[in-house]
Every structure is written in C-alpha cells, then in structure tokens.
Regions:
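Short S/T/G/P-rich N-terminal loop/turn motif that feeds into the first structured element of a domain
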Residues: 1-57, 65-75, 99-100
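Conserved short beta-strand edge segments in small beta-sheet-based binding/regulatory domains
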Residues: 37-41, 85-98
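C-terminal structural segments of small proteins and small subunits
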Residues: 67-92
Length: 100
C-alpha cells in the first residue's frame, strides 16, 4: 500500500492571534502522536518567496502509512472536535492529499 501525504493550507481569519494558531498546530501535533497510522507531522507559516500563496498563511502536512489510516483519522472523534475548533478561526482552507 502507498503512503499518503495529507496537506492542509490555511488562511486564518483576521484577528486570529499567534497564540491561537500555535495552539491549533500543537493540538494537531498531539493528535498525530495518538492516532495510529500517522508517521509524521510538520506545520508552520508559509515561507515561500514566490508570492503564489493566494493569501494562505500557514499549513501542515501529515504522512499516513496508507489511505485506510488517513480515512480512519478523518472520522476520528478527536479529529472532528479539533477540526470544529480550527474552522472557527479559518477564512480559507485547502486540503490536498497525495498518494506516494
């Protein structure tokens, strides 16, 4: 089975504090350490000099062992709670998965 890269690109709503953003990413890190099938998690602000981010300011990437691990994560209750909290702060979100 192929690994899956789960990519989230985010533009937070105006007025969202750095502390709120850090908490969201820390909570996703905690989640990634407790959900089976997640091999890696990285997150941070956009640092591209190309100017093609279309306002997206932050992102994260999770690497899953396979598509079934990703699918289990998507319906995980802790993920659902965290997603709800995150979406309250998000103006724009793009999710893109790549099978390796």
């Amino acid at each position: 089975m192929s690994k899956v890269k789960h990519i989230a690109l985010i533009k937070f709503k105006e007025g969202t504090s750095e502390e709120q953003i850090t908490k969201i990413f820390d909570d996703f890190l905690d989640l990634s350490e407790n959900v089976p099938g997640i091999e890696d998690y990285v997150a941070g602000p956009n640092c591209s000099p190309e100017g093609q981010s279309e306002g997206l300011t932050h992102g994260f990437i999770m690497t899953f062992t396979d598509a079934s691990a990703r699918d289990a994560y998507l319906i995980n209750l802790d993920h659902e709670k965290l997603k709800t909290a995150e979406l309250a702060l998000v103006e724009k979100l793009i999710i893109f998965d790549i099978e390796l």
